[in-house]
């Protein structure tokens, strides 16, 4: 799992450069209450986000899913959208902030 998470982070760093704000593991894997069927929840927050960039991020993560034969649930947000979710006290933003483990 550590190798997979390291690969996600390093691959995204190459793709996004200084546009990447944070990559966070959250959900059952971060809390430690996962089982063998649990997916891996990853939140990726970037400074700016276009439709094309979002597609590139999902493609990169899909390649890693195939390589490691795992299911990765990927949430990609711009800095602005993440701030909006936090301000509106949306559960997903709270979960990422509270239980998330930065990669």
What does each of the following model-derived ranges do?
Residues 1-21, 31-32, 36, 47-103:
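Catalytic core of pol beta-like nucleotidyltransferases
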Residues 38-44:
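Short beta-strand->loop micro-motif that forms the acidic, two-metal-ion catalytic signature
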Residues 28:
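P-loop (Walker A) phosphate-binding loop of NTP-binding proteins
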